[in-house]
Curated annotation (Swiss-Prot):
Protein name according to UniProt: Putative antitoxin VapB38
Function: Probable antitoxin component of a type II toxin-antitoxin (TA) system. Its putative cognate toxin is VapC38.
Alphabetic keyword roster: Toxin-antitoxin system
Amino acid sequence: MRTTLDLDDDVIAAARELASSQRRSLGSVISELARRGLMPGRVEADDGLPVIRVPAGTPPITPEMVRRALDED
C-alpha cells in the first residue's frame, strides 16, 4: 500500500542506514519498526512482581533513598 508520511530527517536517515545494512527495502524496514512500536510492551514478572532490568553497575535503590524521596513530597 502506498501512502505519504512526513518523517523527521534523523528518522529517515537511520531507517535508510538500517535498510542498507540489512539489504532490505526502506519500506519493509519502516513497516517492521512501526509494527514493533505498535506492539504492547511485555512486562517480565517474578512471583507476580514486575522485574525492572537495569545496566550492570547501576547502584541499588536503598530503603533510605525511598524514605528521603517520600519525605520530599
